[in-house]
Amino acid sequence: MTMDRPPAPPPPSSDPRDARRHDPEADATSEPDSSRGGMEPPAEPQLLLNGAAKEAGRPSPGPPAAAVPVIELVRRGGSLDIKSREAAGEAMQRAPGAEPCRAAEAACEARMVQLSPPALPLQPPGRAMLYNLGQPLGTIGSGFFGEPDSFSMYGSNRVKRRPSPYEMEITDGPHTKVVRRIFTNSRERWRQQNVNGAFAELRKLIPTHPPDKKLSKNEILRLAMKYINFLAKLLNDQEEEGNQRGKVNKDSGIVQEDLLQDMLSPNSSCGSSLDGAASPDSFTEEHDTLDSKHARNLHHAILPVEGSAQR
């Protein structure tokens, strides 16, 4: 009686696909595929880990498990569920001797996953600053953080400060032009008000027939010149008249002094009468002299009247 020996397991270093190719059970399971009307098996699914596509360790000739469709796996669990369920299906379809090769392949996959850098999720700028994932606050050119000497927004070359706190730095700009225009307008308005006030005061001094007659600035100036000339001429006339009156008074004073000297002289009748009794001869002499002077004055006064009558 001879006993059939079971087929020897393939060496560990061989590919599991080769082992599955020599496995009779795998051949038995793959026979129904050819009886399905010649349909090709679906393509092998791929896993996306850290942006790199990797093939699942599923054998190419073997179809997916009948109880778990591929579409249902993708819709329910995503890529990670697909990998775990595929590993379970492969364990059912793989021969017992293929487990060490699967363990070595899983170790290589884990090593490759660890070598790739972890992907950081994208966060908004505010949350990144809160969790210290963005740029540190000390390096940002702000006036509230960091050292005062490391300001990048306001350089020391652009900021100029005067030593005196009362002096203001003026630069040529639109704001400065507006300030200058306002100052010029106010100064011109103040000057015009002063000129108008001076003309109003001058108008009050000029006499006109209607006292409230309105005059232009040119008329006010012309009338003022005429009025000034009239007042100057009037003053000159008054001075000349005063000089003439002074001369007349001086002449009359000289005549009165002569009369007093004549009366006070010792040869006059007044002096002799003071010394002794008045004689009738002296009285007659004085009377004759007074009559002769009076007649002479009357003769001078009548002559102009007669001359005017003859004309």
From Swiss-Prot:
GO terms for molecular function: DNA-binding transcription factor activity, RNA polymerase II-specific; protein dimerization activity; RNA polymerase II cis-regulatory region sequence-specific DNA binding. Residues 1-67, 265-311 are annotated as: Disordered. Efficient DNA binding requires dimerization with another bHLH protein. Forms heterodimers with TCF3. Gene3D superfamilies: Helix-loop-helix DNA-binding domain (4.10.280.10). Keywords: Developmental protein, Differentiation, DNA-binding, Nucleus, Phosphoprotein, Transcription, Transcription regulation. GO terms for cellular component: nucleus. One of its GO terms (biological process) is regulation of transcription by RNA polymerase II. Residues 1-14 have a biased composition (Pro residues). Implicated in the genesis of hemopoietic malignancies. It may play an important role in hemopoietic differentiation. This is T-cell acute lymphocytic leukemia protein 1 homolog. It is found in: Nucleus. It comes from Gallus gallus. The keyword Protein biosynthesis does not apply.
